[in-house]
């Protein structure tokens, strides 16, 4: 087998492959053994007629299709491996020469990772981003902790706004029970707008043990079309009324919800966690700004299949999340009134940016000879094993060579990100002109 490569622009290649006649003959024989049973030849049982008789009766090309597929599947992966091309698309194949006793020649046109010259990536100048910790953030976290540790206390009085009521209910439209429109011991927070408009308001003033019929109208845009705009009657019984009591913010509260002895220690811990989160956000935004500046000085002709593959990744991620909530991707598209094409289009700009940044980082890693060390790989495997609650050795058993390479690539990209950040000129807004080196 021989092949030659012709580069087409910065992101395409045409590979011409010549395969020896014996290989194509091997494919013809395999095609014959696979398909002989489908041909009828007088005097022979299905599958027993000689190949030469079938070819004479149906034409020499009768076994070509499967033979061609066999030769392509046998030779194309080897060509890509030997050529060292970084192919990012399926090949468009054109058969140049085919026939018994002849060498088999084909051309494969493919998209490859684009060739490009890097713009300036060291000493990129950006403005420092900072997000100081606001006391409002600390107070918000404390309130969240109070909510999580709230007590629900029964009260002997009529229902008020904000109460948590336990109810039995059964809904009817035109005198017929609503499918899925009933429940027992259902907890509802009055004022949460969980139910149909008007339902919760009519519970206000009811007492424990009281029963009542509530009249409501389903919204015109209700998710179940058969109920949209319909008047409904709900038979409701209030079984319990509770109020939410939030704990006092004091040292006892801090002891109950954390390992700290005082409220001030808890606040300090919350403040530090917020600071870490804010610092990470600021760093991520500065890295994004550095990559944007590098991209402005770097021209890359990104192959369309790379963008489409990235969009596929985003859409598949959405579909997986929807599945978790019991909804299909198709039903979701119907609910939001978009076609697959329209939905995919909203990810295009994000996908282009992600692919572009990865290409830039890969190139920087190559130029700067950034590698993933065995120690770094082991550390990442330990992190993944902990995340999946596995022993490291068990995780390794499950990972293929491709999986390991993918993990290494992730380490290299992260090191390339660290490299451009550490080599940037970060200027404080308070001191324009004064470089804040990392």
From Swiss-Prot:
Superkingdom assignment: Bacteria
Organism field: Caldicellulosiruptor bescii (strain ATCC BAA-1888 / DSM 6725 / KCTC 15123 / Z-1320) (Anaerocellum thermophilum)
Role summary: Involved in protein export. Acts as a chaperone by maintaining the newly synthesized protein in an open conformation. Functions as a peptidyl-prolyl cis-trans isomerase.
GO CC list: cytoplasm
Catalytic activity: [protein]-peptidylproline (omega=180) = [protein]-peptidylproline (omega=0)
Subcellular localization, as worded in the UniProt entry: Cytoplasm
UniProt KW keywords: Cell cycle, Cell division, Chaperone, Cytoplasm, Isomerase, Rotamase
Protein known as: Trigger factor
Ranges for domain PPIase FKBP-type: 162-247
Family note: Belongs to the FKBP-type PPIase family. Tig subfamily.
């Amino acid at each position: 087998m021989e092949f030659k490569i012709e580069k087409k622009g910065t992101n395409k290649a045409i590979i011409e492959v010549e395969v020896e006649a014996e290989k194509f003959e091997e494919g013809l024989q395999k095609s014959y053994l696979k398909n002989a049973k489908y041909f009828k030849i007088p005097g022979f049982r299905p599958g027993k007629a000689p190949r030469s008789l079938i070819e004479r009766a149906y034409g020499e090309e009768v076994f070509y299709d499967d033979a061609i597929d066999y030769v392509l599947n046998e030779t194309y992966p080897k060509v890509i491996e030997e050529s060292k091309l970084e192919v990012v698309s399926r090949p468009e194949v054109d058969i140049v020469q085919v026939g018994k006793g002849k060498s088999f020649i084909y051309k494969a046109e493919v998209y490859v990772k684009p060739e490009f010259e890097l713009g300036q990536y060291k000493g990129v100048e950006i403005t420092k981003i900072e997000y100081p910790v606001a006391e409002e953030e600390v107070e918000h976290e404390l309130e969240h902790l109070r909510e999580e540790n709230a007590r629900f206390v029964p009260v002997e009085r009529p229902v008020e706004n904000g109460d948590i009521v336990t109810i039995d209910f059964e809904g009817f439209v035109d005198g017929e029970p609503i499918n899925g429109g009933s429940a027992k011991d259902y907890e509802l927070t009055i004022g949460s707008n969980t139910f149909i408009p008007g339902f919760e308001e009519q519970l206000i003033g009811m007492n424990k043990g009281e029963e009542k019929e509530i009249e409501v109208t389903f919204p015109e845009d209700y998710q179940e079309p058969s109920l949209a705009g319909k008047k409904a009657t709900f038979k409701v019984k209030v079984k319990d009324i509770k109020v939410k009591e939030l704990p006092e913010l004091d040292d006892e509260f801090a002891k109950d919800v954390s390992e700290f002895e005082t409220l001030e220690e808890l606040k300090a811990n919350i403040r530090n966690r917020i600071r870490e989160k804010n610092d990470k956000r600021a760093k991520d935004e500065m890295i994004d700004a550095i990559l944007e500046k590098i991209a402005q000085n770097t021209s890359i002709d990104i192959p369309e299949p790379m963008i489409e593959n990235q969009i596929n990744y985003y859409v598949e991620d959405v579909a997986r999340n929807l599945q978790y909530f019991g909804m299909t991707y198709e039903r979701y598209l119907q609910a939001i009134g978009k076609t697959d094409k329209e939905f995919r289009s909203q990810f295009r700009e994000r996908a282009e940016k992600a692919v572009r940044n990865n290409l830039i980082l890969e190139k920087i890693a190559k130029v700067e000879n950034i590698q993933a060390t065995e120690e770094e790989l082991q550390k990442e495997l330990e992190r993944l094993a902990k995340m999946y609650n596995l022993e490291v050795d068990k995780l390794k058993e499950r990972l293929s060579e491709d999986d390991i390479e993918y993990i290494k690539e992730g380490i290299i990209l992260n090191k390339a990100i660290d490299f451009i950040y550490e080599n940037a000129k970060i200027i404080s807004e308070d001191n324009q002109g004064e470089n804040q080196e990392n």
